A protein has these predicted regions:
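PLD-like (HKD) phosphodiesterase/transphosphatidyltransferase domain
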Residues: 43-119, 251-252
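PLD/PLD-like phosphodiesterase catalytic module centered on the HKD motif
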Residues: 1-40, 84, 94-252
Length: 252
């Protein structure tokens, strides 16, 4: 389960060409001048106006203190929502974004979240946080700074997919007018380690298409703690008890 966008615009193409050339360097010429990861210099977001729409392009990774790293960029958009946030993602393991959603829910914003069934019940899944659950890993340790919701959020679940399929979307729709998408999983690795693409597209017309996809996936989705999650929770409860939170590794 995925999607594809075609954007016919020279300015947007130029931004992507610049990113490609950073990584290509001189290609197979033998010089060690290809730039990947943080070696790209942590480029700032580029905004391009497209008439009735606008697109912001960000190429991670960035350092954790960079003001425009990917997770912060997403959080900024979530904080702009006044009515509704719809999210469909493959991986959701960023505690900061779970914390942001918790605050938006408290402020009355309607939030729906769907995640891939295979990922949602893993120990580092923030889907579990939204459902008020904590799952120790194979070492009986909990994620550092883990903060499950004190009141489980009802509008969280996993779509029903054909055997072998995955929910590979990485999108959110804000107030039916802004779309967050790209290759960027909602994870610290995507923000700080991987070479990724994150797009913020301001277009009610495009948002309508993504909202239709969200509604399609939502119909028939399993909401709340699924049987698969419950089995994992029970298995780890027997093996680990409540678990212990991870502690920082001492420097040096």
């Amino acid at each position: 389960m995925n999607h594809q966008l075609q954007i016919s615009d020279r300015a947007v193409a130029s931004v992507f060409k610049t990113e490609f050339m950073r990584m290509w360097g001189d290609g197979p010429g033998g010089l060690q001048n290809s730039q990947f990861g943080r070696g790209k210099g942590e480029p700032n977001p580029a905004r391009i106006d497209l008439g009735e729409a606008a697109i912001t392009v960000l190429f991670p990774p960035h350092g954790r203190q960079h003001p425009h790293h990917g997770l912060q960029t997403i959080a900024n958009e979530l904080n702009k929502a006044s009515r509704r946030i719809d999210i469909a993602v493959f991986v959701f393991s960023a505690q900061t974004l779970a914390d942001t959603l918790q605050q938006r829910i408290k402020e009355g914003v309607s939030v729906r979240v769907l995640a891939d069934p295979g990922f949602a019940s893993r120990p580092f899944s923030e889907v579990l946080d939204l459902l008020g659950k904590a799952l120790p890993d194979h070492e009986c340790l909990l994620e550092r700074h883990n903060r499950p919701f004190s009141e489980p959020h009802e509008k969280v679940g996993t779509p029903r997919l054909a055997r072998g399929d995955k929910l590979h979307h990485k999108f959110a729709v804000i107030d039916n007018k802004t779309v967050i998408t790209g290759s960027f999983n909602w994870s610290p690795a995507a923000a700080h380690t991987n070479d990724e693409t994150l797009l913020i597209i301001e277009s009610p017309q495009l948002a309508k298409h993504f909202s239709h996809e969200m509604d399609r996936l939502w119909r028939g989705a399993e909401l709340g703690v699924t049987a698969r999650m419950q089995r994992n929770l029970e298995r780890q409860r027997i093996h680990c008890g409540a678990g212990e939170q991870r502690t920082p590794i001492p420097a040096g």
